[in-house]
């Protein structure tokens, strides 16, 4: 009887466990893998059913049989999203709009999600304990046009060959333009890749791509007589691009405890992943990458691979592959509001200043804040707390640029609209672990961190990042991206031939470069402090050039037990000829 009771109890527990998990097969909604059927309206229907049937505490799985799925603008979810560090153009067409979900797993089982036109592939908003895994995101016809240089004559210009998937035409005004489903692009700039190695071409940075006067001299061969650049030898591959970034591949907002596992973004017209105002994000084997060594493409995303704006908790990014993107592999920061009005001793109006970062929530009652003088990047007054906050220039937060904020304690009298101050939200700042990743063959920088909480960067390979491999920034003047780094550990990484090109803030392989207009007038230090400062140890640098470390306005900097190996793979060219260049840095230890 006792054994029977145990068995009965086990059966009850098993059934309870099973009943608390509900599986939805996308095929049950009439969507089959490897068909030409538009998946967008099917996903709308499936997600509506999941939300309608959800019971509190239930775990839900939405599963795709392995294969290829096509998503088009027609029938997609239409949303007004304001996305940090992107163009604030609305509405947006969303292929998979996951909103107000709990305990949801979306399992692609190795599927390819292919998008057409101009879409936001996946969004996850206001959700808790969700897992996205085992799928890839790509576009059938990317907005970046990949071309190969066929001929280069100093007097006669360049002949180039668009990649087979590029749809193009010569417009009436004789300019080369690419086009696709609902879009047309004229590419003003480009990034040059070595045709054999896929490294960015040495000392080219952003190149102009003037195609005025273009003509087709043979099938899929375009002569651009005004495009003259001796660095682009035949065989060079150019990713022709613009500066727009309408949507990321994956958009996360107001989520708690999100995990993304074994997901690959092969192309997005903005960033690979953008997360804002989220708490606790884990990326495991996430990639913004090509489809293997045989992939004929050289590029991935139009901007950063991953970007975290105004998040808190812990950001964990491990064992990922980031390559071919047009900006950083990871960027972690908050956003300064500029003080544009002092209403009374406890009330200020703060404004989003950058043209690609506005329209979304900035803070909540109870959040801790501090104030920074823009020209010297020094803290003024004491930390304070938000009592109330509401949009000032609009009735609702969505689309707002300005906020009326009342604080718990009186605000220092010097902080007003004339004196140039920013407000930093300290509550929405994350701890970061960036470990075991490969970053290679990308434009600009390898990684960028601007958070006061503990940041560990370890066991990564930075391979031909073209600009600085690691940047610690902070800027209340241009990008308005917070903030100071108080405790950073950079250890056991390998850096291979970074700085083959020059980009913003790239003074050395590791560049600690806050934007400080009046450095001479600064009395405090921006980065570092009693929390632990910045420690760079047990790393290996393989380089052809001089600059290894640049630091500005740091209190507490340690560089020890690192190995520097010189090679002759490129000719030294960087204007910074110093191995270590320190400006206003104190409490320093340098021991190679």
UniProtKB/Swiss-Prot annotation:
**EC?**
3.2.1.n1, 3.2.1.n2, 3.2.1.22
Protein's cellular compartments: Cell membrane
Q: Which GO terms describe its cellular component?
A: plasma membrane
Sites of N-palmitoyl cysteine lipidation:
15
Report if keyword Cell inner membrane is assigned: no
Q: Which reaction does it catalyse?
A: Hydrolysis of terminal, non-reducing branched (1->3)-alpha-D-galactosidic residues, producing free D-galactose; Hydrolysis of terminal, non-reducing linear (1->3)-alpha-D-galactosidic residues, producing free D-galactose; Hydrolysis of terminal, non-reducing alpha-D-galactose residues in alpha-D-galactosides, including galactose oligosaccharides, galactomannans and galactolipids
Q: Which residues form the signal peptide?
A: 1-14
Which parts of the chain are PbH1 repeats?
Answer: 429-451, 452-474, 485-538
Record's bilayer topology term:
Lipid-anchor
- GO MF: alpha-galactosidase activity
Instruction: Write down the superkingdom of origin.
Output: Bacteria
Residues with covalent lipid (S-diacylglycerol cysteine) sit at: 15
Key words of the record: Cell membrane, Glycosidase, Hydrolase, Lipoprotein, Membrane, Palmitate, Repeat, Signal
**Family under the similarity heading:** Belongs to the glycosyl hydrolase 110 family. B subfamily.
What is this protein's name?
Alpha-1,3-galactosidase B
Instruction: Give the species this sequence originates from.
Output: Phocaeicola vulgatus (strain ATCC 8482 / DSM 1447 / JCM 5826 / CCUG 4940 / NBRC 14291 / NCTC 11154) (Bacteroides vulgatus)
GN (gene name): glaB1
